[in-house]
Regions:
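Membrane-embedded, hydrophobic transmembrane alpha-helices
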Residues: 1-94
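Transmembrane alpha-helical segments of multipass membrane enzymes and assembly factors
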Residues: 12-29, 51, 80, 200-217, ...
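Membrane-interfacial entry segments at the cytosolic side of transmembrane helices
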Residues: 54-62, 86-96, 212-215, 344-357
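Active-site lumenal/periplasmic loops and adjacent helix-entry segments of GT-C-fold
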Residues: 104-287, 322-326
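Membrane-interface alpha helices of multi-pass inner-membrane proteins
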Residues: 272-275, 306-321
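Membrane-interface transmembrane helices that cradle and orient dolichyl/undecaprenyl
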Residues: 283-284, 288-305
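Perimembrane helix-loop-helix junctions
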Residues: 295, 300-303, 327-359
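Conserved small/polar residues in nucleotide/adenosyl-binding loops
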Residues: 364-371
Length: 375
């Protein structure tokens, strides 16, 4: 219960900060960005404070104080514009997000529960095929980060710095420290991050596609329910073998419609093979999509507030998921060149905002590297 209340407090602060900084965004975008910002602060601020207080309850209390300070800064820098109300296009977008996102989130909650040390009636513990390998590593991070001195080290190799983007696992450690069972410490934040990913993908698609809500729906379904045409091999002549190949989908080891090594078919489903087992990637997508949204929005609206928020957001990504940070960097470079070509009359403003963005991210990481070297 304490873990849930702690998370809700960060989400509330994040929603307020986005409300002050971007009041003219639609309510859907404000809520999604606000909750995402709250989760990002819950990931990063305790770890930041742990450099002085270790990853303890004291560091988590200090993280709340730091979040309140950031909220005060956002209030001081707030945009004094009327709050955007729900419009008809927002209601249609909400209907699309509910139709796609709610079933996917329910499926995700079930998969998170069944794939991450699910207790059985006889006392045994079970996991999924997809999580069988990764889960051991993530559990070691989640349990060992509790009360650990920072910067963190590998629990199985004393004295060796943890060279892994650990903030998603640190989020689970926070839940674990505040009394949540170990399996639910993976399930609850994992489900939350998956829900944010679904919502973020559809809002990003809306940003790019405009009011084409059917296209947003198709894009989301094609992305999250991918897998190729391997199912044809399972359902071809299914009646002749008493559905043996169909039963093997549920009982065979890594024999799925999307992944059939014997036939050299190796498609990976986004949900089953990436988001469920690869927790760093899950955190990276949940936090990387808002950064991408802010990048596009700040350029279109020529907003220095959004540029500053983007810079701080991007600065946290390497410890969430390094590949997401690299992808954001590549997209940022290409988007900068495209804007310079397309908006020649605003080249100076574009370069100033890009310089602030790049400078803030670079300075943050140079300072972090210098601090780490001195420890």
């Amino acid at each position: 219960m304490i873990a849930i209340a702690y998370t809700l407090s960060f989400c509330f602060l994040g929603a307020q900060m986005i409300r002050w900084l971007m009041p003219q965004k639609s309510p859907l975008v404000r809520v999604w960005l606000g909750v995402s910002l709250g989760v990002l602060m819950e990931m990063g601020l305790p770890a930041l404070c742990a450099n002085a207080l270790d990853f303890t309850v004291a560091a988590h209390i200090a993280a709340v104080a730091a979040a309140l300070l950031l909220a005060a800064v956002c209030y001081a820098a707030r945009e004094k514009a009327p709050l955007c109300a729900m419009r008809e296009t927002d209601r249609r977008q909400l209907a699309v997000m509910a139709a796609v996102g709610i079933p996917l989130t329910a499926l995700s909650a079930y998969l998170q529960y069944t794939h991450n040390i699910m207790p059985a009636a006889d006392g045994s513990l079970w996991c999924g095929q997809a999580t069988y390998g990764d889960l051991c590593m993530h559990l070691s991070f989640v349990t060992s980060l509790k009360n650990m001195r920072f910067p963190p080290s590998y629990s199985l190799l004393a004295g060796t710095s943890l060279a892994y983007p650990y903030l998603t696992d640190a989020l689970s450690t926070t839940f674990y420290m505040f009394g949540m069972p170990l399996n639910l410490s993976l399930v609850v934040p994992g489900t939350l991050l998956m829900a944010l990913t679904y919502a973020g993908y559809m809002l990003l698609a809306q940003q790019l596609l405009g009011g084409r809500h059917k296209a947003v729906t198709v894009a989301a379904l094609l992305f999250f329910l991918n897998g190729g045409l391997g199912f044809l091999y399972d359902f071809d002549l299914a009646f002749t073998d008493n559905f043996a190949r169909i039963r093997e989908i549920f009982t065979g080891y890594y024999r799925t419609p999307a992944n059939q090594p014997d036939l050299n078919l190796r498609f990976s489903n986004v949900i089953a093979d990436l988001m469920i087992p690869q927790r760093a990637l899950l955190g990276g997508w949940a936090m990387g999509i808002p950064a991408l949204y802010l990048l596009i929005s700040s350029a279109r609206e020529k907003s220095y507030r959004q540029t500053a928020l983007l810079a701080l957001w991007a600065s946290a990504l390497p410890l969430v998921h390094t590949h997401t940070f690299l992808a954001l960097g590549l997209f940022s470079g290409g988007y900068l060149l495209g804007n310079l070509v397309e908006h020649r009359q605003d080249r100076r403003g574009i370069l100033i905002r890009a310089g602030l963005y790049l400078g803030a991210v670079s300075y943050t990481h140079l300072r972090a590297h210098e601090t780490r070297s001195n420890l």
